[in-house]
Amino acid sequence: MSRKYFGTDGIRGEVGTSPITPDFVLRLGHAVGRVLRGTHDRPVVLIGKDTRISGYMLESALEAGLNSAGVDVMLTGPLPTPAVAYLTRALRLSLGVVISASHNHFMDNGIKFFSARGEKLSDAWEMEVEAAIEAPPQWSDSSQIGRARRLHDAPGRYVEFCKSTFSNELSLKGLKIVVDAANGAAYHVAPDVFHELGADVVRIGCEPDGLNINDGVGATSPQALVEAVRMNGADYGVALDGDADRVLLVDRNGRLYNGDELLYVMVADRLAQGEPVPGAVGTLMTNMAVEVALQQRGVEFVRAKVGDRYVLEELVSRGWQLGGEGSGHLLALDKHTTGDGIVSALQVLQAQQRNGRSIAELLDGVELFPQTLINVRLAAGQDWKLNDRLARERIAIGNELGQSGRVLIRPSGTEPLLRVMVEARDAAQARLCADRLAVAAQEG
């Protein structure tokens, strides 16, 4: 049975359009509360949010719904998604909730949940909540209505947690670091983490106004960080997204490092420290050069479906620690239960510090294969899997590339698009092959 409201990362959509409306979120809060009351005598739920103006409205509706079901609520105000996961676990709470649409612009918002262990919840739990949404409400007796209070020291608690993932024997003294918080949830915590570890911090994307989240700044618009690093003569730049669960880095030369490269650095550092790394998990989109480089070092590499949720599932099933996506969602499960942009940046900077080499030097010999990605718009009702011309072209190109490249064709999960990606050692060849596939997809 498919889910009606939940997607791959909670519930998300345009504000004012179902399901991101105050009335639905009230019902959602009540439904979640009823589910929790089935397993907890007096549940306590932590609610965090990013800096979107709609967060105030949705927070109030969610709080009211939970209270109406007899659930107590703790409010953190703007706080990164991974901070909510951490605090839910650290404070032994029943559930953590984040109101955020991550890297999207302010017009969108969403709601996602973490278990008492700070982990994303199962499909079965989400189905149970959806059933409760459709059922008639069961209001609590007046004496059993939940209470709400603010957790005023939430930012400070999270800053200390982030710092604890960085070696006590190291510091960032002598480094100038530009921190770009995307005008999002980490605007008031990310700069403090790097500053308290000794770095000279320059802030950009740290002035949210409710409307400017992810607007020309952050991990989805890294050029702003590249320019700021150069302008300030900084050693490194750190770009987070709106809820700070992903990160990209920039060095003093303006070179941008994506999640694939940062994952390799994290794995290589563990190996250099003599720590066992049996394997790492990427996605179908992870650059082939990273896979080859890791295998040459004796590290098994497995590809999951696109999405940090699937990377996490694969890591847990195999008992591994490190994984990630090119977008900057990185997982180090011995440090945190979920992807954390700040913690991931610290792991990379720690590798740079204790190896005495720049990030570029740590990536020496790992040259990313050129990738060409084309989005092909599909006609209504068009089934790309029945396109014989596309199938023949895909086989032909696969034979041409051999072990020096690969082809990936997959549908978008949100739009009527077919994503065609070709990876090859030669950029011109990747482009030519991708164009051939796109034409076949459109005309087949």
UniProtKB/Swiss-Prot annotation:
Mg(2+) binds at S102, D241, D243, D245. It catalyses: alpha-D-glucosamine 1-phosphate = D-glucosamine 6-phosphate. Activated by phosphorylation. One of its GO terms (cellular component) is cytosol. InterPro entries: A-D-PHexomutase_a/b/a-I, A-D-PHexomutase_a/b/a-I/II/III, A-D-PHexomutase_a/b/a-II, A-D-PHexomutase_a/b/a-III, A-D-PHexomutase_C, A-D-PHexomutase_C_sf, Alpha-D-phosphohexomutase_SF, GlmM_bact. It holds the Pfam family PGM_PMM_IV. It is an enzyme of class 5 (isomerase). The active site is at S102. CDD domains: GlmM (cd05802). Keywords: Isomerase, Magnesium, Metal-binding, Phosphoprotein. Its cofactor is Mg(2+). The modification Phosphoserine is found at S102. GO terms for biological process: carbohydrate metabolic process; peptidoglycan biosynthetic process; UDP-N-acetylglucosamine biosynthetic process. Transmembrane segments: none annotated. Binds 1 Mg(2+) ion per subunit. One of its GO terms (molecular function) is phosphoglucosamine mutase activity. Its EC number is 5.4.2.10. NCBIfam families: glmM, PRK10887.1. Catalyzes the conversion of glucosamine-6-phosphate to glucosamine-1-phosphate. Belongs to the phosphohexose mutase family. PANTHER family: PHOSPHOGLUCOMUTASE (ALPHA-D-GLUCOSE-1,6-BISPHOSPHATE-DEPENDENT), PHOSPHOHEXOSE MUTASE. This is Phosphoglucosamine mutase. It comes from Leptothrix cholodnii (strain ATCC 51168 / LMG 8142 / SP-6) (Leptothrix discophora (strain SP-6)). The gene is glmM.
